[in-house]
Amino acid sequence: MSDISHENNGYSQESFMKLARTGPATSLTMNDRGLSTVIGTNRDSTGKPISSKTKYEFNRLRTWDQRSKSRKTASFSKAFTLLHGMKTKLGISNNVVENAAYIYRKVVSAKLTRGRTMSSLIAASLYAACRENNIPRTLDDIAKVGNIERRVLSRDLRTIIKKLELNLNQYDTSSFISKISNNMNLREKTKRDAFKILSLCEKEQITAGKHPVAQAAASLYISCIMNGEKISQKKFAVESGISDVTIRNRVGLIKKTLKLIE
C-alpha cells in the first residue's frame, strides 16, 4: 500500500518532483515503525499467480527474512498487539497509543523489562500516556482490560515514572465527571450542576490532594440529589471504581463546606 496523495508545496514540476515521496506513514506502534519490507505471498504486483519456481524462491526469502528479525523486534510485535487490543477496549485515540508506544520503547531501552511481565509494562505505559494527555482512564480500567492485577500494574507504573523521570500531571477532575455521567446516562442538567459543585469545591480549596475520581463521583451524587435523580452511592462506587466509604466521606465534606443540601 502506498500513500500517493500530495504532501508538499511544489509549484513547478521540478520542485514537486524533488519534494515528492511515496510510502505509508511510519508509526511507533509497529515493531519496525513501518519501515521494513514485507514479502507478499504467491502473487505478483498485478495480482496474478506466480510460477512454482518463483514461489519456491520467495518462500526461501520469506523464511530468511523471519529468521533475520531480532528477538527485540519479535517482542515489540507482541507488545504492540497487546496495546492495540487495549486501545480497542478502552476507546483511546491513536495519538495516545503512539505516546504509549514511545514510553514502552523507552522502557525497553532502559532495560526495565527484567523480572516484569510484558503485559504489565505495556499497560503501565498506556496509563502514563493517558495521564499525559488527560484521558480519563483509571488504573482499574487499564488493569481490567489488560487482565493484570492492580497492585502489579501500580508497582510497575511507579518504577517507570521513577526510572524514566516522567512528570505526570494530576487528572482534570471535570473529565471524570463527563465520563461517569455519560456511562450512567445522567441528565445534562445534573452534569452541569456537578461541574458547578466542583468549581465551588476548588474555590474552597477542598480538592487538593484528593482522588479526582472520588471527587467527581461525590459531585455527581450531590447533583443527582439536587435534581431528583435517585441513584445510590453504591451504584456510583461500582461505576467509578471507588469504594462507597470514600464517596460517602467526600460527600460529607462537600455538604459541610458548601452547605448545598441537608
What is each stretch, according to the model?
Residues 1-262:
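Non-catalytic, interaction-prone regions of core transcription and DNA-replication machinery
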